[in-house]
């Protein structure tokens, strides 16, 4: 595993796969030419993939697509505004007001998602402002230093989204239908099935059981290849029963105050040798 220090991330996001990237990439297929991140979220999967392919980050949440477009087109202006933004509960609360200015709306979204607990401020105000209280590091308050460091690292994110990277705002069915061809690879990280989690309304656009069935039906008809992430549960095992299934290592989960295990389902066979140590 290459570790996470060399990877880029714009913001934390509920269900994000930043700590799982090496495991996911190890089971990506070979010889695809278009990576489609169908439920993009923070887009860490497509942002960090190094293969020479077209990369499409699709996300239906307009706050997220606006943020990435503004970062791409107005990088210096947005980062300067964020560096001038205080780590403040008052600021956090005020950033829930919608702005007609795209740059200001991108700044407000970033404040919400980065100054909240576990990135849940992307759309849930009741998750609250993440105040620094006890934890310190060499730069002072850990929460504060993370805020400042994350803003400075946005330059690297901006560079990444200018390289073979396109942003779309389709619903998942339209995204798949629009791009599907033999060399397309769809990475799908839909909202976790409610059968596999205790909390609800964690996403701006939740997924019902019918949505999961609809996605699986569509993926079973595609010309390309697909990988689906989720937690182990009866629903996912039923709708992907004919797919290859791999259990990833158990990891600590701060939101759940326990441990979780991600599962991936694939409609293709293992195509790599010694896949956990493959360079990609």
Language-model segments: what does each one mean?
Residues 46-51, 178-181, 234-242:
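Short loop/helix-cap segments at secondary-structure boundaries that form the rim of catalytic
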Residues 26, 31-97:
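SAM cofactor-binding core of SAM-dependent methyltransferases
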Residues 57, 188, 226-228:
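Structural beta-sheet core signal
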Residues 2-20, 30, 75-187, 191-200, ...:
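SAM-dependent nucleic-acid methyltransferase catalytic core
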């Amino acid at each position: 595993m290459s570790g996470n220090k060399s990877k880029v991330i714009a913001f934390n996001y509920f269900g994000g796969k930043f700590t799982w990237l090496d495991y996911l990439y190890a089971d990506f297929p070979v010889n695809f030419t278009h990576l489609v991140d169908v439920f993009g979220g923070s887009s860490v999967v497509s942002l960090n993939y190094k293969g020479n392919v077209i990369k499409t980050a699709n996300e239906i949440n307009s706050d997220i697509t606006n943020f990435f477009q503004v970062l791409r087109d107005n990088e210096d202006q947005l980062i300067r505004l964020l560096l001038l933004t205080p780590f403040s509960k008052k600021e956090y609360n005020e950033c829930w007001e919608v702005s007609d200015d795209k740059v200001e709306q991108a700044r407000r979204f970033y404040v919400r998602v980065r100054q909240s607990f576990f990135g849940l401020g992307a759309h849930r105000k009741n998750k609250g402002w993440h105040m620094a209280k006890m934890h310190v590091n060499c730069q002072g308050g850990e929460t504060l230093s993370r805020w400042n460091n994350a803003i400075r690292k946005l330059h690297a994110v901006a560079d990444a989204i200018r390289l073979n990277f396109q942003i779309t705002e389709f619903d998942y069915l339209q995204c798949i239908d629009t791009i599907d061809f033999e060399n397309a690879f769809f990475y799908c990280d839909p909202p976790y099935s409610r059968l596999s989690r205790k909390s609800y309304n964690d996403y701006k656009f939740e997924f019902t059981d019918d949505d999961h069935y609809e996605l699986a039906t569509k993926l079973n008809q595609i010309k390309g290849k697909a990988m689906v992430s989720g937690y182990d549960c009866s629903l996912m095992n039923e709708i992907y029963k004919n797919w290859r299934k791999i259990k990833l290592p158990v990891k600590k989960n701060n939101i759940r105050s326990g441990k979780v295990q991600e599962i991936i389902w694939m409609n293709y066979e293992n195509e790599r040798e010694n896949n956990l140590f493959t360079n990609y």
